[in-house]
Amino acid sequence: AHDLRSPMGSIKMVLNMLILSLPPSQIGEEMYQMLSMANQSTEDVFALLDNLLKWTKSQIGKLNVVYQDFNIVENIASVIEIFNLVAGIKNIKLRYLGDDKIEVHADIDMMKTIMRNLLSNAIKFSYNDSEIVVGARIVDDSVVVSVRDSGKGMSEEDQRKLLNTETHFSKYGTNNEEGSGLGLLLCLDFAVKNGGRLWFESEEGKGSTFYFSVPLKE
């Protein structure tokens, strides 16, 4: 996975640049759609490799938590900006509702990994022309970050299996996007390692909301 990550990162960067610099009016709608599909596939593979590497390191105790005090809202905004392009392929709007500044005590990279996975999943299971709302609010001595979609949702049986290492699974997204099911387990692991937790609410056919909490700056 480590040997594949660098070349995949280069391919991902080139495809992103092409999509940004070559609008449909210049290369035609069909070619633009093919380019968008290639970009999405590359994003999925890169995310899988990244999750696999981090999960492996975490399980063998080689991934240390580096605590810092930082504004998690800036962290959230940077991830949303990255995913605007991916969401745009399905004409999905990403919106943030919350305070402009919430200082937390956590590992910056791990928080970004959680946000990337939750947003990626929300886009994957959302329908075209919909909206995903990201929120952040202070609850007691923690911040609770939420990612809400109005997509496929989950059955009660799937909800019971989702965050269990023995029964976790993966399903196709609304545009037949693939996944490994590993991302949410990594999110759960990182949330707990930072003194927080991860949970969700879902209703089949109506969508899901995923939450994670981390301690506020003291």
Located regions from the model:
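Helix-loop junction within the histidine kinase core
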Residues: T56-Y67
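Conserved catalytic submotifs in the C-terminal HATPase_c
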Residues: V66-N71, A77, G88, K93-I102
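Short helix-loop "hinge" at the ATP-lid/N-box region of the Bergerat-fold HATPase_c
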Residues: A122-I123
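Coiled-coil phosphoacceptor/dimerization helix of two-component systems
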Residues: D44-W55, N75
